[in-house]
Regions:
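Catalytic binding pocket for nucleotide-activated donors in carbohydrate/polymer assembly enzymes
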Residues: 121-178
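Short, well-ordered alpha-helix to beta-strand connector turns
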Residues: 17-19, 68, 114-116, 139
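Short acidic alpha-helix that forms the nucleotide-activated donor recognition element
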Residues: 105-115, 137
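Membrane-proximal helix-turn-helix segments that form the acceptor-binding/catalytic region
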Residues: 2-21, 113
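Hydrophobic/aromatic ligand-binding patch that stacks against planar heteroaromatic rings
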Residues: 13, 89, 111, 134
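Conserved catalytic-core segment of nucleotide-activated headgroup transferases in glycan assembly
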Residues: 49-108
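Acidic, amphipathic alpha-helical patches
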Residues: 10-11, 105-109, 131
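A short, active-site helix/loop in glycosyltransferases that binds the activated sugar's phosphate group
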Residues: 16-43, 82, 178
Length: 178
């Protein structure tokens, strides 16, 4: 009942007067539209995320690296993104895995490009996790749950459709303001 509390009413007014509200996933947009009646669908757009052209080109250049048999798991104690469930999944399914943390960004991308997959099982809604998009664009097999909100969107279907969609996001954003 957040929308009935004072902070919810303030958010509703903020959304209602906005010229454009950008969302990270269709599910996120639909959840907000359902709760915030002041917000109109025609003022909404789903951007997902924006990557730099350089990072997209880097991912494209390493996506075909030889893969090992390991699934990567984000080493996290966050209550929303705990690693414990992913570790349990890997162990129950006899999957070789490696916990990852504290890697520089391009090191992480290289690690993903040489790994079989990613296990990512958040405990609450995660609108559009970049780690999952990066793993997809790098050819990783994905083990995800229903909390990864963008996982069923058409652009996320294949490695190349994901890459092409992400490559269009900066233009999609800026073209609105031109």
């Amino acid at each position: 009942d957040c929308e009935k509390q004072m902070h919810g009413k303030i958010n509703s007014a903020f959304y209602g007067y906005a010229e454009r509200v950008w969302f990270m996933s269709e599910k996120q947009k639909n959840m907000i539209l359902e709760k915030v009646t002041a917000l109109k669908d025609e003022n909404c757009a789903v951007l997902n995320s924006v990557f730099s052209g350089g990072d997209l080109r880097f991912m494209l250049s390493i996506k075909d690296n030889e893969k090992d048999n390991k699934y990567l798991i984000l080493d996290s104690v966050s209550p929303v993104k705990p690693s414990a469930l992913a570790v349990a999944y890997a162990e129950e399914n006899n999957l070789e895995y490696e916990l990852i943390s504290d890697l520089q960004y391009h090191e992480l991308l290289i690690k993903m490009s040489t790994s079989k997959g990613l296990i990512f099982l958040p405990q609450a809604s995660d609108t559009c996790p970049r780690l999952v998009m990066e793993a997809k664009m790098l050819g990783c097999q994905l083990v995800l749950n229903e909390h990864v909100q963008h996982k069923d969107e058409p652009w996320f279907e294949t490695m190349m459709s994901c890459y092409e969609h992400m490559d269009s996001r900066a233009d999609a954003f800026w073209s609105y303001y031109e």
